[in-house]
Each structure stands twice: as C-alpha cells, then as structure tokens.
Design a protein with these regions (language model features):
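A short acidic, glycine-rich active-site loop
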Residues: 64-71, 123-136
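A mid-sequence, solvent-exposed acidic-amphipathic segment
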Residues: 131-137, 143-145, 153
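A generic "structured core" feature
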Residues: 143, 161, 166-167, 175
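Acceptor-binding helix/loop patch of EC 2.4 sugar-transfer enzymes
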Residues: 111-126
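HATPase_c (GHKL) ATP-binding subdomain of two-component histidine kinases
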Residues: 170
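Domain-scale signature associated with acetyltransferase and cell-envelope carbohydrate enzymes
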Residues: 1-115, 139-141, 148-150, 158, ...
Length: 191
C-alpha cells in the first residue's frame, strides 16, 4: 500500500511542479506532500530528490517540504540535490549548487520575513515589504545537517558541512565543517 501511495504522490507532484511554472530537469523525484508557492523564477536541475513527510523519511516526521519563491525572486537548484522535509523561502535570490544534500527539517531563507523596526512590524501593510533580504548561496557538494537554519546573506562553500541543529549567520569558506548556534568553525576538511 505504501508503494502505491509513493507512486501516486510522485506522479501528482510532477504535475504540481509543471503547473507551478517550475523548470526542472530529468528524473525529478518527490515523495510525499510538498507545498509550492511560485511567483518568481524557479529552476531545478536533474536528479532532484525530495523526501517530504513521514511517508518518506522518518527524520522528517510528518513535516512536509515547502518551497516559496516570491515575486521577482529567483531560486536555482543544481543537479543531484536532495532535500528532506525542508523549507526554502526565497524572496530575493537563493542558489543551491550541484550535489548538495540538505537534512530533514532544515530552513533556508534569504529574508527576515518581517521588518526589524517595531513600528513597521506592527502594521501588516508595512511589515513584510520592509523585511531585509539578502542572497544565499550553497555551493557544490555542501552538506547541511538536519534541523539547521541557513539565514539571509550567507554563502556556504564547496564541500563544506553544516552540523545538525546549526544556525548559519555568516559565510562558511570552502572545505570546512561548522556547527552550533550561531555556527562556528570546527575544522578543515582535508581532501
């Protein structure tokens, strides 16, 4: 029965991606329910894998993946990327390279979503439009551990690893392991 549900959800999700004006490469595989709000540009490379909710990944529990691309924003996801029960909130520019793995329950966002000014934040008409937005880049072969938060304006370098439960608030150079809240340097990766 589970296999039938997975096949059906996969077919339904491919239709959902097509009708959301997402450009995607071959071998798209999305298992479980995924939320999509696409107002800007969104492109996804070949061999994209998304495990969403308890039907597909025990670590994701019953949390569905969600991808939001705001008006005039751009989300670009490379080839061979895998995500699990992940939220990607793009209001400006998010670029995810090739061969990136994103652990369950991770949040990637390029915006504060709300104004940091309490006067603007208290008014629904001025709140979101005054939120600070800065691009995010996750480079090739990066690995983001489960339950991490990737904040606006950061770059995670090639081959770098973010430990589980980390909050990334500043750039991570290539070939390094970072972790914690806020994430700090742990060690170099020797290739």
């Amino acid at each position: 029965m589970i296999l039938i549900c997975r096949k059906f959800s996969g077919f339904f999700n491919i239709l959902k991606f097509k009708y959301s004006n997402i450009k995607f490469g071959s071998h798209l595989r999305v298992v479980g329910k995924i939320g999509l709000t696409i107002q800007g540009r969104c492109s996804i490379g070949a061999n994209f894998r998304c495990s969403s909710g308890d039907m597909s990944n025990a670590m994701g529990r019953n949390v569905s993946s969600y991808i939001k691309v705001g008006e005039n924003a751009s989300l670009s996801i490379g080839d061979n990327v895998g995500i699990s029960s992940t939220c990607i909130w793009c209001d400006k520019d998010i670029r995810i390279g090739n061969n990136v793995k994103v652990g369950a329950l991770t949040i990637i966002t390029d915006t504060d979503a709300h104004s940091l000014n309490p006067t603007l934040r208290s008014n629904n008409e001025t709140d979101g439009i005054n939120a600070v937005k800065k691009p995010v880049e996750i480079c090739d072969n990066a690995f983001i551990g489960t339950s991490s938060v990737i904040c606006k304006g950061v770059r995670i370098g090639c081959n770098s690893i973010v430990g589980a439960g980390s909050v990334v608030t500043r750039n991570i150079p290539d070939n390094e392991i970072w972790g914690g809240n806020p994430a700090v340097f742990i060690k170099k990766i020797v290739l």
